[in-house]
């Protein structure tokens, strides 16, 4: 079996990353993983983790190989360390050993405590050649949600809002519809982000004034769990969040029995409520959270340094007065993405 070059290893690992991204909306709370099997410089099998509870990437890649006799002289590339424990599926490291694949190239080590190097060691103990760290940062970035959830014990948090050219997110109002700052096309991107999240959060004022459904409509995908803060349970019973169509968590100070698809969680709003909320979401295995507003809620996440990325749509129109946009710290770097003649500023915090 010929040694692969650094360029070849990175080429195949990039393919692993491409494959893994196909599982974005379906694998949580598992990580996205892709795998490629190469023999004599040619890809003979590939796969990715499609859905939580189903076969892992390595299994799907091995199943895709038409001539299994080639496995004995192949290299399997995988973006994340193969698992070594029994979960909902058998250990992938055991399957790789069973199929006598002699060489394994891994993007990054698994941060999950039940794996965390054990898969790598099991492969090496079985006499396999194992290389770790090919495109490591890219592979870690791929599973930022999984890493955050398993190391910080909270969801990966994405903040999102649209603001006018003069930095307002809405007019001052006590009723009526909000000012629409997003274009129909950038609104599709918002629904894409919703489909990619496990849960979506708004505060009481946004739920009251906007009466949002917080569902995915302009994109294909599942509806995220709705998370609403309503300290005194003052929201009207006919609000869309109470329609029972989507699992909904209401954080409040008052005791309230569960209704259809609606769970009330009691917390102390006078003692670090965001910390209590994150603990509750972690216990429910919610790996990613999209925070859509309003201003006070978004700013509280920023002030508590409780966020991982933020998407800010910059709109060309001016409002001249109204509700000021949240303020980001100037110390954080950002990239500017152009979407449909709009700028979207993307802030990312380091792992």
Regions found by a protein language model. Give the residues of each.
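N-terminal pre-triad scaffold of radical SAM enzymes
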Residues: 74-84, 152-163
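Helix-turn-helix
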Residues: 34
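Short Asp/Glu-rich motifs
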Residues: 115-116, 141-143, 300, 320
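Hydrophobic, well-ordered secondary-structure segments
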Residues: 120, 136, 140-143, 187-194
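Zn2+-dependent cytidine deaminase-like catalytic core
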Residues: 37-138, 225
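Enzymes that bind and transform nitrogen-containing heteroaromatic metabolites
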Residues: 2-31, 46, 66, 70, ...
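Flexible, polar/acidic helix-loop-strand segments at domain edges
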Residues: 143-153
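Short secondary-structure capping/turn micro-motifs that flank functional sites
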Residues: 112-113, 138-140, 209, 297-298
